[in-house]
Amino acid sequence: MEEAAAASNGGLLYHEVQEGKLCAVHCVNTTLQGPFFSEFDLSALAVDLDQRERQVMSEGAAGAATTAAGDFLAEGEGSHNVSLGGDFSIQVLQKALEVWDLQVIPLDSPDVGSCLFDPELETAFICHLQDHWFCIRKVNGEWYNFNSLYPAPEHLSKFYLSAFIDTLKGSGWSIFAVRGNFPKECPMATEGSNGFGQWLTPDDARRITSSCNQVQTPTQQAGVSLVADQSEEMSEMDMIAAQQEEADLNAAIAASLMDTGGPFANYAAHEESRSQDAFAIESTSGEMSKDGNLEEQGANKSETSEPNSDNIESASGSNPKQNTTSLEGKESIKED
């Protein structure tokens, strides 16, 4: 398998960046390390598979097989191997790789030999979860993650490869080993035939991956801080509205229980009364806290506005006795 992995292409890596839902196309081409298939090629394979499946189901035996065939054919003319968005089934990927004499084997298959399985001895893996496909491929003796959601292939060390595959399996990913005679070289003239591919040196791939990681890290941190700030901005009115909504919900549940009668009626009435009392207490305490804050603010304002008698006397710069003497002198002058 080591010789099969030695694709030359001048030491370049072939990578395709995600376009729509064509991850299956990208997965097949990065497995082959070249733009060998387009979405139209895989669509043709899907149509052929659909026709064969319908033929097999329509020729099924009587009984359960006929019922299953009826259910299968009743789904209309829609394809069972490609969605309207361009997501292809594993059968389509298998057919595409069979063109190049490659086999797609599930890792949980006895053919893989799970007890003695060593991922470093393989050449390529296909990974699938929900609607996404991507390829892990050995090129020139080094492993790369050719996920089309990445701007460039991500290098994987041999130690990390096993841990990465185990993590994928533990997360529910379906993983398939690809075995056979891989194409050793793809003519560079075919580059851009599907409009998605690019040839990169390992250094270029490493540089692109590093730069993207540096750009994403501050953005992710900003996003986390923004969420935290938004969560702290919940006003008291929002809290009161949430409490009112909870009280209304409890009252509605209690009313439905009372309508049923029986032993639930008394319990429902008690729950309804308790929820209403709880909300009233919370609302009252909220209003009291508001009134207390307003009174405290008013007291602070009154203390600030009241003049200090000592300050007034010192500001006038006069003594009360002196003021009294001056008034008596003025009265005596008037009498004379």
From Swiss-Prot:
PROSITE patterns: JOSEPHIN
GO terms (BP aspect): negative regulation of TORC1 signaling; positive regulation of ERAD pathway; proteasome-mediated ubiquitin-dependent protein catabolic process; protein deubiquitination; protein quality control for misfolded or incompletely synthesized proteins
GO molecular function: cysteine-type deubiquitinase activity
Subcellular location: Nucleus
Gene3D superfamilies assigned to the protein according to its UniProt record, in alphabetical order: 3.90.70.40, S15/NS1, RNA-binding
Domain UIM residue range list: 244-263
Polar residues composition bias: residue spans: 299-327
Family matches, as Pfam families: Josephin (PF02099)
Class of this enzyme: hydrolase
Transit peptide listed as a keyword: no
Cellular component aspect of the GO annotation: nucleus
Record: active site: 23, 132, 147
Keywords: Hydrolase, Nucleus, Protease, Thiol protease, Transcription, Transcription regulation, Ubl conjugation pathway
Catalyzed reactions per annotation: Thiol-dependent hydrolysis of ester, thioester, amide, peptide and isopeptide bonds formed by the C-terminal Gly of ubiquitin (a 76-residue protein attached to proteins as an intracellular targeting signal)
Role description: Interacts with key regulators of transcription and represses transcription. Acts as a histone-binding protein that regulates transcription. Acts as a deubiquitinating enzyme.
Protein name: Putative ataxin-3 homolog
